[in-house]
């Protein structure tokens, strides 16, 4: 629909490690809250790659003018900035490299 904005397509392909992390994130019901205009969100998506992001199903668009926006969900979760990961009800703000995503999964309840 008119007025909805989408993030840039993800250019990178997922490494084996990124795909494994994506499976673990999905199994834990993880969510990545972000916005179409957020450069760090784009960086986070590139770190995981197109396949991991596409299969994971954990991206939540928080910008009200973004395609498929779920702004109310972001507000309800208490998201203050982007990107913010949610795992086990805990929020983990900021862009993460693969090692940090692994640590996040290990430390989440």
Question: Can you say where each PLM-predicted feature lies in the sequence?
Answer:
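N-terminal targeting signals for export/organelle localization
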Residues: 1-7
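Short, flexible loop segments at the rims of nucleotide/cofactor-binding pockets, characterized by
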Residues: 8-11, 61-63
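Local sequence-structure signature of Cys/Sec-based thiol-disulfide redox active-site neighborhoods
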Residues: 14-56
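Structural recognition of the beta-strand scaffold that forms the well-ordered cores
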Residues: 31-34, 58-60, 84-86, 91
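Secreted/processed peptides and extracellular or luminal domains of membrane proteins
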Residues: 44-47, 68, 80
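Extracellular/periplasmic catalytic domains that process cell-envelope and extracellular macromolecules
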Residues: 51, 76-80
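Structural microenvironment flanking redox-active thiols in thiol-disulfide oxidoreductases
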Residues: 64-73
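Non-catalytic, surface beta->alpha helical segment in thiol-disulfide oxidoreductase systems
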Residues: 81-109
């Amino acid at each position: 629909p008119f007025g909805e904005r989408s993030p840039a397509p993800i250019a990178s392909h997922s490494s084996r490690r990124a795909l494994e992390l994506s499976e673990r994130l999905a199994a834990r019901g993880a969510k990545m809250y972000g916005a179409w205009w957020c450069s760090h969100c784009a960086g986070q998506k590139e770190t995981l790659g197109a396949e991991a992001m596409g299969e994971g199903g954990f991206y939540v668009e928080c910008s009200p003018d973004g395609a498929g926006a779920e702004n109310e969900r972001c507000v309800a979760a208490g998201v203050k900035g982007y990107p913010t990961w949610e795992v086990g009800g805990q929020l983990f703000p900021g862009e993460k490299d693969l090692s940090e995503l692994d640590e996040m999964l290990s430390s989440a309840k």
